[in-house]
Amino acid sequence: MDEIFQYIKGKTILVTGGGGSIGSELCRQIAGHEPKQLIIFDIYENNAYDIEQELRRKYKNLNLVVLIGSVRDSRRINMVFEKYKPEIVYHAAAHKHVPLMEKSPNESIKNNVIGTYKTAYAALKHGASRFILISTDKAVNPTNIMGASKRLCEMVIQSMDAVSKAGRMDVLPLLHAHMDKYFEDQIPGDRTTAAMKNQTEERSSVHIESVKNKDRQGTQFVAVRFGNVLGSNGSVIPLFKKQIEAGGPVTVTHPDIVRYFMTIPEAVSLVLQAGTYAWGGEIFVLDMGEPVKIDSLARNLIKLSDLMIFTGKGFHNANTIQILLNNRIQTVI
């Protein structure tokens, strides 16, 4: 679309989590809109390497930078913003697998919530014009840790936008990682003093950065929320296919749960479009058509595989759809 082309063309774009299923498609579509520079930031080197090779083959003149690092690392993130000065940030880095996050809730909070805060903080400090958070429909009245963490991410983004509009970045809390450079030469007894000194100096530098960027309109923070994307990492369909190939069971958390689905290119195209419309503070909800019951989806996938269904009660109160394969019920021992 012309409006997306004009929005992206000639700008420096940062995509965190750029090697993931959503992040890599963002990079593909952004690369086709002639950015001044595209920066891919990801902690997983194999994913980052794969998308780098693909883009370099397809877009010979693309100014592409691929960086390895974590959004949980304040100093690394700050260095990226300080060196490359991205104008638009797409924040796709996140832990997305619901069952894994139930077992490791602290990691979900650290990577999703704290990682979002640190990246948004750097974007505001260094004068990025727009920050787009990739969120999920699981953030609506969340029933799991991952969904709750993404809802907190949305709240962080809306708070950041309010701070940006007020020009009061100095009121933002400083995290421990913003201070640790002052601890390197301190003995343990001096750490409290060092931390207090750093808080004062950091707030002073933040105020100076805010004054420097007064001529800008401030960073606009928005979130884009969508449902399950077909074929993406963490999506339920690849999981169901693997469970079916293994002979079952196919597990559904609850028979009444519904989800929305669209393809990865469709979802990313709408994310880019939402970014062009943003004024700051919005949570865009993509129109993904009619909701689909996960239970019905699982049953239809089993039927498409020419298998029969047996339904029973599984572990952890999950509704387990078992497959009748070669006249024997395939079940978990």
Residues covered by each model-derived region:
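A conserved pocket-lining segment of Rossmann-fold NAD(P)-dependent short-chain dehydrogenase/reductase
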Residues: M101, R216-N228, L239-M262, E266, ...
